[in-house]
Structures are given as C-alpha cells and as structure tokens.
C-alpha cells in the first residue's frame, strides 16, 4: 500500500463515488478506472519522511514529585481557551494536517493530565485517537496515524478537513471548552 496526498476536490470526488460501506479508496479508483477489483496483496507501508513533522527524541529523567497544594492544582486544570492557539503558530504549519496536529498539541500542553479524555472520541466504526500508532493501524490500515507532538497520543489524519475540524471541536469540548468557542477555534485552525 502506498500513500498519496490529494487535494480536497479530488478527495470529495473519490469519496462521492463510494458504493458500499468499507470500500477503500483503492477499490473506488480501480472501479472508476476500469481496473480489476480483485484482491491485491498489501505490502506493509514504508515510513514516509516528513521533515517538518519529525521530532527529536526527548530524554526523560525521573524526579521525585513535589506535593502541590490543592488550590494550585485546581488553577492548573482551568484551560484558557481564548489564548490556546497562536495565529502565527498556525500559519507556520504545513497544510491542514500540520494545523490539526498543532492545535491538538496546544490542547495537550494546556491540559496534559486530562488529555486522555480524547480517547473517548470515536466514530461509529472509527477510532480517532489512541496511545499507539499500532492501535490506530489495527483499527484501520488507512488511518495514517501521526503522533500529537511528543505527547504519546496518536491521531488518525486520513480524514477530510471538515472531519478534522469536527474531531478538534469534539476534543476541545471534551476538555471543557464551550461548544461555541470550540467551533470558533476549529474554524480558526482548519478554515
């Protein structure tokens, strides 16, 4: 299996030609091009180098946790959603996937201890978030999982921009954002 990027118009066209649930993009294209839709042996995907998305390994050192007064803990759980995303940070990202990952990384940095709540966000037959690349690939071979910064959380990125926006908005609401502000932030990140 090889991965290619297509623009939004082509994606919508191909998706619009779906005839049955679970039909892959390869099946649709084979049918549209008049090629045999017979079973094709799948080869494990080769990792694609994405220099803008690569992160240096982080060295972790263990430290004794310091007791924190309850008042400070309560203050840290509040997320300032009005200041969550930087327009300059968004503009520096490459494409919708980059902005999607940037927004999720900002959300993780704002509430790292609560971020695991996004694991509850799932589609009818889809898994959007996981704690490993393998879990997303097991759920869908075409998930194109990407790590959210160096958080240890992974997200599927093979959705169209509108679906990415919806997933981001659901993640924001899951972590306490007002739905109206979540929609506004989703549109800012993935207009």
From Swiss-Prot:
Biological role: Negative regulator of replication initiation, which contributes to regulation of DNA replication and ensures that replication initiation occurs exactly once per chromosome per cell cycle. Binds to pairs of hemimethylated GATC sequences in the oriC region, thus preventing assembly of replication proteins and re-initiation at newly replicated origins. Repression is relieved when the region becomes fully methylated.
Principal location: cytoplasm
InterPro entries xrefs: Arc_rbn_hlx_hlx, Ribbon_hlx_hlx, SeqA, SeqA_DNA-bd_C, SeqA_DNA-bd_C_sf, SeqA_N
Subcellular location: Cytoplasm
Species name: Shewanella amazonensis (strain ATCC BAA-1098 / SB2B)
GO molecular function: DNA binding
GO CC annotation: cytoplasm
The protein's name in its UniProt record: Negative modulator of initiation of replication
SUPFAM superfamilies referenced in this protein's UniProt entry, alphabetically: Replication modulator SeqA, C-terminal DNA-binding domain, Ribbon-helix-helix
GO biological process: negative regulation of DNA-templated DNA replication initiation; regulation of DNA-templated transcription
Interaction with DNA: annotated segments: 96-97
Keywords: Cytoplasm, DNA replication inhibitor, DNA-binding
Pfam families attached to this UniProt entry: SeqA, SeqA_N
Family: Belongs to the SeqA family.
Subunit-level organization: Homodimer. Polymerizes to form helical filaments.
